[in-house]
């Protein structure tokens, strides 16, 4: 594939970019996975997380929300010895905290997908950046999502992390305009006009 988005640096990046990033997702398990992985990525490269993704799936019960919500302090201590994940206590504990928050979100909103997608009106925002460097780090929508997730007790859900989650799960199409994946994701997601970038 020619003219991929310029953030793609490795083969793992390329596979993720070509097959998953920006594709609209309404699957609660996948959305929970990306919520946890985007939080784990804070301060690290995304390539580091992609290289540990299989380890995360094994360590966190294939991202079954109810299973992770039942993790005990003993289970958390064992995870902190697992080289297959980022062994940061706050991040590991946040995965369990966030699973319990997602349970409450599902009870109140029917699904995690319904809750998350409500912040873009149920339809992906279609941007058309000439370069990925032009894309914002956060928007009014990610600010609102961050605030709402924090209200449920979620951790590692700042606005920048939330915007990365929105990009990853297709709530926002931030593929570069010249990237072949842009048109494919746009066709999958509909035609909502691009939102203006948040003022700095």
Task: Identify the meaning behind each predicted range.
Residues 1-200:
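HhH-family (HhH-GPD) DNA N-glycosylase catalytic core used in base-excision repair
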